[in-house]
A protein has these predicted regions:
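A generic short-segment signal for beta-strand/edge and adjacent turn/coil regions
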Residues: 11-18, 35, 59-61, 71-77, ...
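Charge-rich, well-structured scaffold segments of protease-associated domains
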Residues: 1-17, 84-213
Length: 213
């Protein structure tokens, strides 16, 4: 029925799909990009390669929880420590791109706190690498991620988005199966996932020269 309903729509047969090469590992030295605009708040973004861990890999659930502990929830190290405790950022969070193997950190900072904020973000990641994860941090991350998946079951739009992503990736796991995988991830596995993260790029948006100095 769906094919029949869509059959009358015009289709462009001359579709060109550009070549795309996905790098799963970072270069020897991180790229550092700085830009200056007429802005009142600095932006610090940091991109990490997952060392080959994508949604097709067995250790992907551990990387999901690693990202959640790092900066993916309001109980994360970036939010609780870099933002709340140390007040180095107006906001700080991280997201995991499951198909390209990326963890992207985004934060808003004062211009003169660039180096301090950058170093502290890396220090928080090092804590995870060393297994310095409190039980409440891991369980809070686990409950938040699983709760987000389960909430999808009550929303048709989110279910459509979920299954579109699974179909594009060629994956068949449903939400209950993913939740079961997340339930068994240990603190040691999260630390091992963090050890695979490689800093690839740092981007700093600052004010123009002389602004707010």
């Amino acid at each position: 029925a769906l094919r029949s309903a869509l059959s009358a729509l015009p289709v462009n047969q001359n579709r060109v799909v550009p070549d795309c090469e996905v790098r799963l590992t970072a270069g020897t030295n991180p790229q550092i990009v700085e830009a200056a605009l007429d802005v009142t708040q600095g932006k610090l973004a940091m991109g990490f390669r997952t060392g080959g861990v994508t949604c097709w890999e067995e250790d992907y659930p551990a990387m999901v929880l690693c990202n959640a502990v790092f900066g993916g929830t309001t109980l994360s190290k970036l939010f609780m420590n870099v933002r709340e405790k140390l007040s180095l950022c107006y906001y700080a969070s991280s997201v995991l791109e499951k198909m390209k193997g990326l963890v992207l950190v985004s934060s808003g900072i004062e211009f003169d706190k660039y180096e301090t904020a950058r170093d502290e973000i890396l220090a928080q990641l090092d804590q995870i690498r060393q297994g310095e994860i409190e039980d409440w941090e891991l369980e809070g991350a686990r409950r938040t991620v699983i709760g987000g998946y389960r909430a999808t079951l009550d929303d048709q739009g989110r279910q459509e988005e979920f299954w579109l992503g699974q179909s594009a990736a060629g994956l068949e796991e449903d939400i209950p199966a993913l939740c079961t995988q997340l339930e068994t991830v240990t603190k040691e596995q999260v630390a091992q996932a963090a050890q695979k993260l490689q800093l690839d790029t740092i981007y700093f948006l600052k004010g123009k020269e002389g602004q707010h100095e």
